[in-house]
């Protein structure tokens, strides 16, 4: 910093300056040189023009703004002229009254341009003088208070907030669980002047904080830009300015004690729903865009508010109308809907609107034609219009039919004729009707999920019918009696082709050991066999009923009968069939004929035979 030129008064009085330098006060100040004497400088820095922005137009009129700007410039000049006046007062060139006049009037600006700042020594003298010269500083602060908005008291600035919080507590005591800081339109109309006063007081307090923390022009907002009608509680320092800048978004904070909160951006003012009370709040500024937090009750949480398209409505109506008596929606092109492959005609219904057929005659208008065609088809096939699936609960299970599958009486009576689809396509009548294939079906490689047709089993039945051998339709379930310690038998495949067994003269089977690898286990020493489970191919020749009994019950009878055990463990035995019923007194009632051939007793070894 260059040394400013001295004024004429300073040049003209060098003797008085030397007296000041030789004074004991000057020597005392020189000894205190390590002490930083720039303490009052921060007080004068906020008085610069950079720290002051033009006040908002809502608080002042244009005349007041121009007046304050002129006072602001004069105060800057007064601070500079004060230093010059103090310097001249030390040398005794000017009386002290001229300095007081400079503080009150801006007419000393011409001297400031000529003089500027004094030397460092003179600045130190000024600091000492300023500490003792309190009346002048009081006048300076009194003059600048008009530029600085008065700092509000905390109770005054937040009176609106305290009043609103007390109201919200009263509403909570009244069992309303959702409260809001925002007010309704009626509250805005009644308390309009109160909210404006609170905002103006808060604005003055923020402007004062900007002086302390050097926030330059960040809070130039008008009353229309503010989004709330109540003072937002501050967090200290100059961060209130950040809290007040809401980026032109209207935020309505909803405090709720329930967990169902739905946050979304809405384009219009929407009511806030609650389970107990319906509280409707609208934004004060009236803008269309804004963020609104609304509390959705639990009863409305699971409601699907998405609009349903016309296509979905049409599908739902069609599905609701479908049933046994509804149209099948055929797509006939050339048959005029008078053939059996027309689903509507085959089911006995007329074609209606959902059908996409062309040149249709299956309508009430052509009733005579439809009836004539039906009679003609029934004359050729009486079961043409019969139901595809007939379910009868009183039916008897047919031969070789598994009870877990679909009963044969409920299967398709006409039968399918599938060749390559394995009865897994919808054009298979059995699969389409939801039933298994039956004997009447002529399908190949059947894999119907509702019930398969076993080709090997039914082919043997057909051969038996052609050979004239009577077949049985009922079988008695075999019963095997085991010891408690006997392990379960190993399951054997049931449906496998077997060789034709030889038949004796008395229509009894003579099965060799090699032919009983399925269902029979034999002993090579005696040739007596035990059939565990008869094969279905044996049922076509004769009725077979096997009887097995516990070894403990038959221990005495087994001594006189030719019985051979089947295994070393002696767990199963087979009884031979004797020619005379008297020789088997141990046989129980209801027992069937045995398949095993009886052998004569061994000759005695006595010499007289």
From Swiss-Prot:
GO BP term (any one): stomatal complex patterning
GO cellular component, one term: nucleus
InterPro entries, per the entry: CRC (IPR005172), Tesmin/TSO1-like_CXC (IPR033467), TSO1-like (IPR044522)
SMART domains: CXC (SM01114)
Stretches the record annotates as Disordered: 69-102, 307-328, 457-477, 569-609
Expression across tissues: Ubiquitous but expressed mostly in flowers and at significant levels in leaves. Detected with highest levels in developing ovules and microspores, and in petals.
Compositionally biased residues, Basic and acidic residues: 69-84
Domain CRC stretches: 326-451
Biased composition (Polar residues): 466-477
Location of the protein in the cell: Nucleus
Entry's Gene Ontology molecular function annotations: DNA-binding transcription factor activity; metal ion binding; transcription cis-regulatory region binding
Entry keyword set: Developmental protein, Metal-binding, Nucleus, Zinc
Gene knockout outcome: No visible phenotype.
Function: Plays a role in development of both male and female reproductive tissues.
Family as reported in the entry's similarity comment: Belongs to the lin-54 family.
Record note on domains: The cysteine-rich domain CRC binds zinc in vitro.
Protein's name according to its UniProt entry: Protein tesmin/TSO1-like CXC 3
Species this protein is from: Arabidopsis thaliana (Mouse-ear cress)
């Amino acid at each position: 910093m260059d040394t400013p030129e001295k004024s004429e008064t300073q040049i003209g009085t060098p003797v008085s300056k030397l007296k000041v330098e030789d004074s004991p006060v000057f020597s005392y100040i020189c000894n205190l040189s390590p002490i930083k004497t720039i303490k009052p400088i921060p007080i004068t820095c906020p008085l610069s023009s950079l720290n002051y922005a033009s006040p908002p137009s809502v608080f002042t009129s244009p005349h007041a703004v121009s007046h304050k700007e002129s006072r602001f410039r004069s105060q800057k000049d007064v601070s500079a002229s004060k230093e010059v006046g103090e310097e001249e007062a030390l040398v005794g060139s000017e009386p002290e009254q001229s300095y007081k006049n400079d503080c009150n009037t801006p007419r000393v600006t011409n001297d400031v341009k000529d003089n500027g700042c004094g030397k460092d020594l003179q600045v130190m003298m000024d600091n000492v003088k300023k500490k003792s010269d309190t009346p002048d500083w009081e006048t300076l602060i009194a003059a600048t208070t008009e530029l600085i908005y008065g700092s509000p008291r905390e109770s005054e600035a937040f009176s609106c907030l305290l009043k609103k919080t007390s109201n919200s507590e009263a509403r909570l005591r009244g069992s309303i669980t959702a409260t809001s800081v925002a007010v309704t339109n009626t509250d805005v109309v009644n308390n309009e002047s109160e909210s404006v006063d609170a905002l103006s007081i808060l604005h003055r307090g923020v402007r004062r904080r900007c002086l302390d923390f050097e926030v330059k022009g960040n809070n130039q907002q008008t009353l229309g830009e503010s989004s709330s009608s109540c003072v937002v509680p501050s967090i200290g320092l100059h961060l209130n300015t950040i809290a007040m800048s809401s980026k032109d978004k209207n935020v309505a904070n909803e405090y709720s004690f329930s967990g169902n909160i739905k946050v979304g951006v809405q384009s219009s003012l929407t009511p806030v729903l609650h389970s107990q009370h319906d509280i409707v709040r609208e934004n004060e500024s009236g803008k269309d865009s804004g963020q609104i937090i609304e509390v959705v009750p639990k009863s409305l949480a699971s409601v699907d508010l998405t609009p349903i398209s016309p296509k979905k409505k049409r599908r739902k109506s069609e599905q609701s109308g479908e049933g046994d008596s509804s149209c099948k929606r055929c797509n006939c092109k050339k048959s005029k809907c008078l053939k059996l492959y027309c689903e509507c005609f085959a089911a006995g219904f007329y074609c209606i609107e959902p059908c996409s057929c062309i040149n249709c005659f299956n309508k009430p208008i052509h009733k005579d034609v439809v009836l004539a065609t039906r009679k003609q088809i029934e004359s050729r096939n009486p079961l043409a219009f019969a139901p595809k699936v007939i379910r009868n609960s009183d039916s008897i299970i047919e031969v070789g039919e598994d009870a877990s599958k679909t009963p044969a009486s409920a299967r398709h009576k006409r039968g399918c004729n599938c060749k390559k689809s394995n009865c897994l396509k919808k054009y298979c009548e059995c699969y389409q009707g939801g039933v298994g294939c039956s004997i009447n079906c002529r399908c190949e490689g059947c894999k119907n999920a509702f019930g398969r047709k076993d080709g090997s089993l039914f082919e043997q039945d057909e051969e038996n019918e052609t050979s004239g051998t009577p077949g049985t339709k009922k079988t008695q379930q075999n019963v095997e009696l085991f010891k408690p310690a006997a392990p379960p038998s190993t399951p054997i495949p049931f449906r496998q082709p077997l060789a034709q067994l030889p038949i004796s003269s008395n229509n009894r089977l003579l099965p060799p050991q090699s032919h009983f690898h399925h269902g029979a286990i034999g002993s090579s020493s005696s040739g007596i066999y035990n059939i565990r489970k008869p094969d279905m191919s044996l049922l076509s020749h004769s009725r077979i009923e096997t009887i097995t009994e516990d070894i403990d019950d038959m221990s005495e009878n087994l001594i006189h009968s030719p019985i051979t055990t089947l295994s070393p463990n002696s767990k199963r035995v087979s009884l031979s069939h004797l020619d005379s019923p008297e020789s088997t007194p141990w046989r129980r009632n209801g027992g069937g004929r045995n398949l095993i051939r009886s052998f004569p007793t061994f000759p005695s070894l006595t010499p007289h035979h």
